[in-house]
Amino acid sequence: MKLIEKTMSMNQFRTMEEEKQDGGELFHTIEVAKVDRNNVSQPPPAATAALLEVPGDELNLIPPLNFSMVDNGIFRSGFPDSANFSFIKTLGLRSIISLCPEPYPENNMQFLKSNGISLFQFGIEGSKSKCLPGLENEVWLHIWSSKHQKEDFYTNGNSKTSEPFVDILDQKIREALKVLLDEKNHPLLIHCKRGKHRTGCLVGCMRKLQKWCITSILDEYKRFAAAKARVSDQRFLESFDVSGLKHTPMSFSCSNR
């Protein structure tokens, strides 16, 4: 074998390898180009500027507080405001489920109207004290654990109170679930004030229909509620009866779990 090296024009080098095979000669040719690093052309300034140009709307995609995807076509968050509108538009929503009892802000209503988004509002009080004044968490839990005892009343000081909040919560969650599980309403966003407790209860009840184990349901609830996790909410999720909703159609991704 012998190597033959020749100098080529245009600063190129050609190396030829000569091999003898079966009495014949086989040549392999390799061309190597020498690059002058001092003479590399640069893109024009206009082209560089075009590469860096980003539409203003894309720089303002701010998700609402505690935003997350729940399932295909289902999202959750805290109460969205005008800073979140550009982001929400990217979701292509058909519906919003609001779990807040307060009148929906006019600015938000205008946004929904201009984007063809339907609003389903199921007002659930966010503070236990507003529904059960003066009752501590332990007493509220006792109310919840006895919710099927129709004649049961509970004393707080010298006053008596029944269990209105438990029944209202159960009723509102069931109404909201019917909207949530109807795929005609998807894509859909669920929200309360901060996307923790009321939203967590609704999502947790949906998980029961998806046959999640209660440990996983509570883990998801606590992941969003964090240090604000309420024992009362967790008891509600443990006790929520889905038997009357088992025939509700669910065709989205996790329905067969």
Curated annotation (Swiss-Prot):
The active site is at 192 (phosphocysteine intermediate). Keywords: Hydrolase. It catalyses: 5-diphospho-1D-myo-inositol 1,2,3,4,6-pentakisphosphate + H2O = 1D-myo-inositol hexakisphosphate + phosphate + H(+); 1,5-bis(diphospho)-1D-myo-inositol 2,3,4,6-tetrakisphosphate + H2O = 1-diphospho-1D-myo-inositol 2,3,4,5,6-pentakisphosphate + phosphate + 2 H(+); 3,5-bis(diphospho)-1D-myo-inositol 1,2,4,6-tetrakisphosphate + H2O = 3-diphospho-1D-myo-inositol 1,2,4,5,6-pentakisphosphate + phosphate + 2 H(+); 6-diphospho-1D-myo-inositol pentakisphosphate + H2O = 1D-myo-inositol hexakisphosphate + phosphate + H(+). Coiled coil: none annotated. It comes from Arabidopsis thaliana. The keyword Hydrolase applies. This is Inositol diphosphatase DSP2. One of its GO terms (molecular function) is phosphatase activity.
